[in-house]
Curated annotation (Swiss-Prot):
Superkingdom of source: Bacteria
UniProt keyword Acyltransferase present: no
Organism of provenance: Edwardsiella ictaluri (strain 93-146)
Cofactor(s), names only, from the UniProt record: [4Fe-4S] cluster
Name of the protein: NADH-quinone oxidoreductase subunit I
EC number: 7.1.1.-
Length: 180
């Protein structure tokens, strides 16, 4: 080993230590996730939830449109009916290990029962734990649309009253009378 090689080797060691010293106290680009919350865009599509009406009843009417719209087929449900004729899902199941969070189920839902939230912390150790049942999906609030009530907007037959006679219900419009 010559003196020149020794000086070059020593110089590279000093240069390396100098570069480490420069970058050791610089501002870090890496965000420390649990301590610093991650910025999520306003329209971020995360975990799917089932919401309730402002009255507290389930919004889902088990129309099966969400399951049909799902491109990967991860939604399954079974329709049941109450004594007053209202439909509800007897069971509602989403397999999040197959879900691609595309949001097509939310767009297809006529009652805004299915909504995508900005929650993304869904990691599990076992694949079976990613199958969510209705009890896991149902939240206590109305979600993004707090004032929307499907049965008030769409109407539902009430025993003993004709269309347009119920409280907060508009009179029916004769659409054929609107033609020129």
């Amino acid at each position: 080993m010559t003196l020149k090689e020794l000086v070059v080797g020593f110089g590279t060691q000093v240069r390396s230590l100098w570069m480490i010293g420069l970058h050791a106290f610089a501002k870090r680009e890496t965000k420390m996730y649990p301590e610093e919350p991650v910025y999520l865009p306003p329209r971020y599509r995360g975990r799917i939830v089932l919401t309730r009406d402002p009255d507290g009843a389930e919004r889902c009417v088990a129309c099966n449109l969400c399951a049909v719209a799902c491109p990967v087929g991860c939604i399954s449900l079974q329709k049941a009916e109450t004594e007053d004729g209202r439909w509800y899902p007897e069971f509602f199941r989403i397999n999040f290990s197959r879900c691609i969070f595309c949001g097509m189920c939310e767009e297809a839902c006529p009652t805004t029962a299915l909504q995508l939230t900005p929650d993304f912390e869904m990691g599990e150790f076992r694949r079976q734990d990613l199958v969510y049942e209705k009890e896991d999906l149902l939240i206590s609030g109305p979600g993004k649309y707090p004032d929307y009530n499907f049965y008030r907007m769409a109407g539902m037959a009430i025993d003993g009253k004709a269309k347009g006679e119920a409280e907060n219900e508009a009179k029916p419009i004769d659409v054929k009378g609107l033609l020129p």
